[in-house]
Amino acid sequence: MGKITAILQAAQQRAKEMNLSYEGALLPEEANEILKSAPGAILVDVRTRAELDWIGGVAGSVGIEWATYPGMKPNPHFLAQLEQQVDKESLVLFLCRSGGRSHLAATAATQAGYSDCYNILQGFEGDMNNESHRNTLGGWRAAGLPWKQS
């Protein structure tokens, strides 16, 4: 079994255990490996433009807001924007701050006919620690994975 297959199978098993409606749930390190090794894999960052500008993001990702800043109002054009930028047959990985919005995006994309959707658990910044700070408990940045500041 190849590395990509093993990672995707683990993510699919996780999704079954978590009773998720989309294909799989990846850890940040697994998502990074998929992006490096799986031809055609696409990372969709669903954080707000403000988050991308102020906090940073993953180079080469497609940015489509799930909700807009300020106010975190749902983006009524999310699926239309996704369809303009991402083929429905692509292996699509969704990322947000901590995994919540990306879960919603992966669910919506699956319902809209995307067949290979994965949520990146822990998100870009991870969960808050005891001092209410992010970037120390899980997440893309805390894992030391590549990212860029705008």
Where do the model's predicted regions map?
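Rhodanese-like catalytic fold shared by cysteine-dependent sulfurtransferases
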Residues: M1-A41, R49-L91, S102-S150
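Conserved G/P- and acidic residue-centered "switch" motifs that form tight phosphate/ATP-binding loops
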Residues: D45, G99
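Short, surface-exposed ligand- or partner-binding patches at beta-edge/loop junctions that are enriched
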Residues: F94-L95
